[in-house]
Amino acid sequence: MSAFEPNPLVPDRFKGTCRYAVSWAFAGFCRARCFYCFAGGQNLQQPLARAWTDEDAMHTWGRLRSQNGPMWVGCSGIFEPTEELGVLVALSVAGHYGYIQTNLMAEPGELADAVDPGRFDLHPTFHPHVWRGEAPAFLHRLNRLRDEGFTIPFVAMVAHPVYFRWLEQWVDEFVDAGYATNVQPMRSMQWAGKDYPADYNDAERVVLRGLMPGGDPVYTDNIEPVPLRIASCSAGHNYCCISRSGDVMRCAQVPNTEPNNIFNDNAIDWDAEPLPCGEEFCRCNHLYALHTTEVDAGDHADAVDA
């Protein structure tokens, strides 16, 4: 394979293997039943319908590998990817790499059988509702998956007001067990008559800033959205989003008006160069990894129009 520019979203150990990164929100079910689920997952009685099969996924992702080489596939979204192990098998067999966002409710042995732990990292999220607020039970399963060979870069948590008083304790427990943590504020949610993240009080903001990962402006500055100071973005150039139905979008915040669909035998139409972004705010988890040119806030409109 010819050399290509390293993708900032791909872990260092795979930068020479995966030119492109994609996020695929294929999951359509979750058993966690968290009362605070913003997507209504607590009310799901069965998986959401889909028009494609696991076999379709196997064929499609095999074709995408032949067109793009092995890709870094983020198995994420609002529901639980491990509820559809057949899709994870398809991605692994097709020869891709990536990560799986998970609540760890799947049996560790089943997950290790579905995907190659050497190809897929785990991005687990600790949901206190599922584990009755007990980090040790979650850690037991986490350690089993680590023993299976999975790389676990961090354990994520959301700073829900109901659980805020225990956040520092849980972070300490995970760090003591050898895991980095990624605490994120609630975003665009209401609880007990308050709007979050705007209504975190000053004391909570001090705690949050102490727990959130440092060194990246999306984490240290973006408790609330901040105006973009970006001239161009690599979304659509070396990264894209794919919906559950298979529609290909430049990014989840600004969908394409006429997206391709991977299940219609369409190729992903990568942009030749990073493109300007006309949004006032960016809510992408990859902020500042995808954005390639930073400009002064006052120059943003000119940069977009250029």
PLM regions and their residue ranges:
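N-terminal [4Fe-4S]-dependent radical SAM core
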Residues: M1-S23, N285-A306
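Canonical Radical SAM [4Fe-4S] cluster-binding loop centered on the CxxxCxxC motif
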Residues: A3-D56
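Core AdoMet radical
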Residues: A21, G41-W52, N68-E83, S92-G109, ...
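Aromatic/hydrophobic pocket-lining residues that form the small-molecule binding cavity
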Residues: A57, E84-L88, A135-F138, L167
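N-terminal active-site wall of soluble small-molecule enzyme domains
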Residues: W61-L64, L85-S92
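Short, well-ordered alpha-helical microsegments
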Residues: T82-G86, A106-E110, F164-L167, M249
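Conserved C-terminal portion of the radical SAM core fold
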Residues: R132-N222
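Accessory C-terminal segments flanking Radical SAM cores
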Residues: A192-A306
